[in-house]
């Protein structure tokens, strides 16, 4: 059995973490070794970088600084968690990965795709997710959900225009590579979203055992 790398993507309030946990439980019912992780973060060092990225601050963070911190955390995460798990045949479920960088730093911050792609190749080599679930919903719905959770982090404090650009970047990436991306309507009820995940489950299990 070969490892499978599945990422869950989407803007704020899309329910990625909840549905990552749901998918993990369903895969474990099939006896699969599942590793749950997230970005930025996933290791103690990468989690400290996450704190730098998310904590509101009086000092404005340059877009290039943000981008480099994201990839620094990712390099550690790949070395310590993702690559070892895939090597032993596990299913890795990651809440955000490099698609988020193209969406947030590319779409939201306006950094060039070429700059991001250069770092992607340097840090990841040929490693890309096998499957990416994109949880899509209107920006105003996602921001309302995020606000209901409590104190907003540095990204969640951005305005609607930023998140519209993030959403469009995700949708464009999903449209360009439909063989890798599955687009899910996250504006539905949680039960409806999880029914959509269940519909994908047989194909995922088959790929894990193939």
Swiss-Prot record:
Gene3D superfamilies reported in the protein's UniProt record: P-loop containing nucleotide triphosphate hydrolases
Record-listed ATP binding positions: 10-17
SUPFAM superfamilies named in the record: P-loop containing nucleoside triphosphate hydrolases
Listed transmembrane segments: none
Enzyme's top EC category: transferase
An example Gene Ontology biological process: dTDP biosynthetic process
Keywords annotated in UniProt: ATP-binding, Kinase, Nucleotide biosynthesis, Nucleotide-binding, Transferase
InterPro entries documented for this protein: P-loop_NTPase, Thymidylate_kin-like_dom, Thymidylate_kinase
Catalytic activity: dTMP + ATP = dTDP + ADP
EC numbers for this chain: 2.7.4.9
GO molecular function: ATP binding; dTMP kinase activity
Database matches in Pfam families: Thymidylate_kin
One annotated Gene Ontology cellular component of this protein: cytosol
Keyword Ribosomal protein carried by entry: no
Purpose: Phosphorylation of dTMP to form dTDP in both de novo and salvage pathways of dTTP synthesis.
Family according to the record: Belongs to the thymidylate kinase family.
Protein known as: Thymidylate kinase
Taxonomic source organism: Pseudomonas putida (strain GB-1)
């Amino acid at each position: 059995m070969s490892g499978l790398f599945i990422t869950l993507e989407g803007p704020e309030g899309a329910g990625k973490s909840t549905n990552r946990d749901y998918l993990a439980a369903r895969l474990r019912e099939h006896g699969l070794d599942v590793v749950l992780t997230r970005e930025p973060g996933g290791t103690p060092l990468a989690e400290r970088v996450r704190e730098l990225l998310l904590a509101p601050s009086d000092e404005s963070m340059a877009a290039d600084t943000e981008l480099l911190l994201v990839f620094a955390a990712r390099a550690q995460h790949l070395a310590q968690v993702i690559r070892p798990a895939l090597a032993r045949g596990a299913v890795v479920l990651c809440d955000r990965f490099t698609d988020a960088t193209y969406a947030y730093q590319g779409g939201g911050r306006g950094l060039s795709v070429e700059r991001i792609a250069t770092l992607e190749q340097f840090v990841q080599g040929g490693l890309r997710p096998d499957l990416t679930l994109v949880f899509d919903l209107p920006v105003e719905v996602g921001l309302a959900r995020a606000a209901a959770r409590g104190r907003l982090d540095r990204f969640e404090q951005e305005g609607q225009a930023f998140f519209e650009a993030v959403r469009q970047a995700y949708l464009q990436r999903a449209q360009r590579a439909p063989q890798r991306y599955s687009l899910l309507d996250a504006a539905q009820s949680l039960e409806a979203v999880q029914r959509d995940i269940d519909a994908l489950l047989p194909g995922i299990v088959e790929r894990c055992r193939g």
